[in-house]
Regions:
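Membrane-anchoring alpha-helices and their flanking helix-loop junctions
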Residues: 1-89, 103-176
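Glycine-rich acyl-CoA binding loop
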Residues: 91-94, 98-101
Length: 176
């Protein structure tokens, strides 16, 4: 909803509602994941070293997701400009156009590998599919309207799967 509002597809008067939908969506994701993990954990008979490794990987992907969504973009440079919003093509956003999808998927994959369970697997698959559909909408509809240079960014940076060149650019821009 927020992206549709920013792309001027929805009226700005709906801003309060878009914030509400974000909070509701976040809470649904959090609660459904917690319930699925709790159910899967109930059937565990013992804990292994491998599960500990998978849990650490879950935490790593979760931290990458949080960093990418909330800290990787410089707010002023990305959102507060005189001549429209510009894309940011350094760090994580040199890797691919939607790096959060990689970390979100990795987080759910390793969470499922840690605890197992059909419910958690189904939830992970649904959430990852919905996340993918969301970034397809962003990439094709909303971001080209929000970011004045998005089509140029699309030519330089891969959609989801990093390339050798984009990995090198990510590392290079992080060093600077």
């Amino acid at each position: 909803m927020y992206d549709l509002e920013q792309a001027r597809i929805l009226p700005l008067q709906l801003h309060k509602f878009t914030q509400f939908f974000f909070v509701i969506g976040f809470l649904l994701l959090l609660v459904s994941t917690a319930v699925a993990v709790w159910h899967a954990a109930q059937s565990l008979s013992e804990w292994s070293i491998l599960q500990t490794v998978f849990l650490v990987m879950t935490a790593l992907f979760f931290l990458l997701l949080i960093y990418t969504l909330f800290f990787a973009l410089p707010f002023e440079e990305t959102y507060v400009t005189q001549n429209g919003c510009k894309t940011y093509d350094r760090g994580m956003y040199a890797l691919c156009r939607h790096p959060g999808v990689l970390w979100f998927t990795g987080c759910y994959l390793f969470l499922w590998m840690t605890f197992g369970g059909k419910e958690l697997l189904l939830l992970a698959m649904i959430n990852c599919l919905l996340n993918f559909l969301y970034v397809v909408l962003q990439d094709g509809v909303t971001f080209p309207r929000v970011f004045t240079d998005y089509n140029i960014y699309k030519q330089r940076v891969p959609f989801l799967i990093p390339t050798v060149k984009s990995i090198q650019m990510c590392i290079q821009t992080w060093k600077n």
